[in-house]
Amino acid sequence: MTVLPDLLDFDPDAALALLGEWMAARGEPAYRAAQVFGRLWQRPVRSFDEMTELPKALREGLAGSFRITALELTTRQKSMDGTEKFLFRMHDGQLIETVAIPDGDRLTFCISSQAGCALQCAFCATGAMGFQRNLHPSEIAGQVRELRMLTPSIVPTNIVFMGMGEPLMNWKAVSPTLSLLNDPRALGIGARHITISTVGVLPGIVALAARPEQFRLAISIHAPSDALRRTLMPVNTKYPLADVIAAAREFDRRVTFEYVMLGGVNDQPEHAAQLAQLARDCRAFVNLIPLHPGGSMGFSPSTTPTINAFAKAIRARGVETAVRRSRGLDIAAACGQLRTERLGRRLPVAAQDHGEVHVA
C-alpha cells in the first residue's frame, strides 16, 4: 500500500514547491499552492474537505495525492492557575504531551519532540518511560496546529521545546519544525520567542547555531560538576560539562542554564558558587526550577528558603537568575506525568514542572 506524502512534514519552501508542481501538472493557477499551504498552518483545518474555498474536484484531487496528519486529543486538563495540559494520541497509538502556559499577555506552548526519552535523567518521568520513537515535523509542529484548531482565538506568543524528549537528538525533524514555527507563511512565531532546550547534545547545538534565525537555546545543567552531573544525567559521560560550556560560549546568542533544585543534592552553597562560575564563563542566564512535588526515587524538593538563598548567592556573583514559578501542580503538569498515568504505570520520579519560563 502506497503511503501518501504528509504535507505537514515539509518545511515551507519544500511544501510550496511540491504543491506548486502538483498544481501546475493539473493546470491549476499558481496561487492555489499558497492557498492550500495557508489552510494547513495559518487557518488550519483537519482535512482537505474543509477547504471549502477550493473547488470540490481540487479538494478530491488533493486528498488522493496527499495526507494531513491528525493528532487525536485524548485528555485535556485545566489547572486552577490557567495552565492547560493536553495528551495526544498519534497514528500508532503513542502518546505525547503538550502544555499551554498563560502568563499575563503571554501564552507559551510547551511541545514534545519525542515519544519518551532515551536519556534517563534521574529525576525525569519522561526518561523513566524509555524511548519509543522520534516525532515527525507533522507531530511536533502539529501540536501547535491542534491547539490552534481547538481554540482558534488563542495564539501562542512563545514556543518552548521543553516537553517530552530531547529535541537535538531529533534534529532531522526539529529543523524543519523550526521553519514551520517561524516562517510567516506558516505559523509566523518570532525566532526569539522559540526556545530549544537540550541536555547539551553538542552536534545539535552546532547545527542550531548555524541557522541564521535568532532561536533561543536553553541547556539543562542541573549540576555544576561532572562528578555530580554524571549521577543525575548519564549523558554527561558522552557530553562532559566542559564541552557543553564551551559550546554555550561559542553560541552567538545568550544561553539560559536550567537547573532543577534537588534537596540536599545540588542546592548547597558550594554548588551555587560553582554554577555561578560556569554561567559567568559564557554569560548565561540561570533559571532555577523547583522540583515537582510528585515522585518517589529519593529526591525531595529544595525548601523555599534554600532556593532563595541559592538564587541570592548566584546573583551576588554577578549572574542574572530567576526562580521558575510552579504551574499546573493540580493537573500532573510535569513532563511525562499525564502520559504515565494514562498508561497505568506508577510514576517513579518527578520531572521538571512547566512553570513560568524565563529566557534571557
Swiss-Prot record:
PANTHER family: 23S RRNA METHYLTRANSFERASE, RADICAL SAM CORE DOMAIN-CONTAINING PROTEIN
Catalytic residues identified in the record: E97, C335
Cofactor details (free text): Binds 1 [4Fe-4S] cluster. The cluster is coordinated with 3 cysteines and an exchangeable S-adenosyl-L-methionine.
Gene3D superfamilies: 1.10.150.530, Aldolase class I (3.20.20.70)
Localization per record: Cytoplasm
Entry binding sites for S-adenosyl-L-methionine: G165, E166, S197, S220, I221, H222, H292
Positions bound to [4Fe-4S] cluster: C117, C121, C124
GO terms for cellular component: cytoplasm
Organism for this UniProt entry: Gemmatimonas aurantiaca (strain DSM 14586 / JCM 11422 / NBRC 100505 / T-27)
Protein name, entry field: Probable dual-specificity RNA methyltransferase RlmN
EC number in record: 2.1.1.192
The organism's taxonomic lineage, starting at the top: Bacteria, Pseudomonadati, Gemmatimonadota, Gemmatimonadia, Gemmatimonadales
Pfam families linked to this entry: Radical_SAM, RlmN_N
Disulfides per UniProt: C110-C335
Gene encoding the protein: rlmN
Miscellaneous notes: Reaction proceeds by a ping-pong mechanism involving intermediate methylation of a conserved cysteine residue.
Similarity-based family: Belongs to the radical SAM superfamily. RlmN family.
